[in-house]
Amino acid sequence: MTNDSIELGINCELVSGAVANDVKPSPDPLSFPLQEMVGFTIDKGDGAATASLDVDERHLNPHGVVHGGIPFMMLDTAMGAAVMSVIPEGYWCTTIDIHTRFLRPCGVGHISATATVRRAGRRVVHVDAIVTDT
């Protein structure tokens, strides 16, 4: 595989406290059932985060390539983790807009989604992210 990538930009809106249906934030925002089922891990730092996955056959679509929802979910999660690293405690974020461009498919191997905060305003945080495979 070549080292082409998937590019993604995101805008997140900051939310303070509980929202509709009294949803309570997870005590560990880097771990949730869907993430555990898919099997990717998250590492975050100051203004950045990376989601990593060892792709196997369960992640492939009927055409033998990674289902597009897998890297998309990893990107969204990494970007959310990057945002959470720069916003005040007690706040959380929700994605308000995502634009993706899939440049080529990925197969079995290792993929990483790396997100970096580009600009953090008072209510909206802009994040850039990219998926690479090895």
Question: How should these model regions be labeled?
Answer:
Residues 1-134:
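Terminal targeting signals and extreme-terminal segments of soluble enzymes
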